[in-house]
Amino acid sequence: MTKVRKAIIPAAGLGTRFLPATKALAKEMLPIVDKPTIQFIVEEALKSGIEEILIVTGKSKRSIEDHFDSNFELEYNLQAKGKIELLKLVDETTSINLHFIRQSHPRGLGDAVLQAKTFVGNEPFVVMLGDDLMDITNPNVKPLTKQLIDDYEETHAATIAVMRVPHEDVSNYGIIAPQAKAVKGLYSVDTFVEKPQPQDAPSDLAIIGRYLLTPEIFSILEKQEPGAGNEVQLTDAIDTLNKTQRVFAREFKGKRYDVGDKFGFMKTSLDYALKHPQVKDDLKAYIIQLGKALEKTKP
C-alpha cells in the first residue's frame, strides 16, 4: 500500500469577504493573533505525517511564498540582537518541503485540485482547505488529517471529513447521504450533494474541508462539468468517484473554526488570543471590563 505523503492546500480564492484587506494581501495570510491562517493548516499537515505540500495560489498571493521562504536580513537582525526565540519562530516556516503552483483563474475547488495532478502522481493525497482550522493542541486527540490517513491505511479508500451542522445551514456545505449508521465514526456514503436547500438535504453531515483522495479523482475532474456557482465542484467529482470506488466519511467531533467569514474569523482570533501566553491575561481582564460596560447599556 502506498503511504500518504502529500497534501494540497488550495489558496487561489479572491477573498472578497475580507475586502479591502485582501485587495493586496492573500486572505490566507490574515493573522490569527500573530500567525497567518495558512500556517495553522501547514502545521496540521506536518503533525499528521505529511512530507510534501503543494499550495495552489492565484494572483496577489506572492506573500504566501514569501512567508515560507527564508529572509536573510530578518534572520541576521534577530541573531545579532539575541532574539533567539523569535528566530526559532521564523525558522519554523522555512524548513518545510513546500511547492507552489498558480491557478490562472479561480474556476472552483475541483479545478484547483486538478492543478496538482503532476505533483501527486499515482499516490493517495490529502486536500486541506484554509477556511477550516482544526484544533490540534489537545495531545490526546489525533489531528483530523491524521485520522483520515489512519482510516485510509485500514480501508484503502478515499475518506472525507464531515461534521454535523444545524439543518438550516446545510445550503452552505457539501452534504453526504450516509448508507447506514457509522462504525467507529466512519460512514459508508450513498451520495454527495453540493449545497442543497434544507428541504432537499439528505442529512446534516457536512463536508468540512479535509479530504483524503485517491489519484483516480483527476481523470474525473478533467471531465467534470461546472456545477453549483458555475464552478468545478470537488464534491461532484467525489460523488462520481463513489460510483466506482467506495468513499467513506469520517465524522469529526473535535473543535473546528470557520475563518471563511468575518464573524467566524473574529471568534477564532478571540479563542486563540485567550490561549496565547503573551496576551491571554490582559485580554480576559479587558473582556470582563467590556462585559460590565455592555451590561450598563442594556435598556
Swiss-Prot record:
GO molecular function terms noted in the UniProt entry: UTP:glucose-1-phosphate uridylyltransferase activity
SS bond partners: none
Top-rank taxon: Bacteria
Catalytic activity, as annotated: alpha-D-glucose 1-phosphate + UTP + H(+) = UDP-alpha-D-glucose + diphosphate
InterPro entries: GalU_uridylyltTrfase_bac/arc, NTP_transferase_dom, Nucleotide-diphossugar_trans
Pathway the protein contributes to: Carbohydrate metabolism; nucleotide-sugar metabolism
A biological process term (GO) from this entry: UDP-alpha-D-glucose metabolic process
Keyword Nucleotidyltransferase: yes
Ribosomal protein in keyword set: no
Protein family membership: Belongs to the UDPGP type 2 family.
Protein name per UniProt: UTP--glucose-1-phosphate uridylyltransferase 2
Native source organism of the sequence: Streptococcus pyogenes serotype M1
Lineage: Bacteria, Bacillati, Bacillota, Bacilli, Lactobacillales
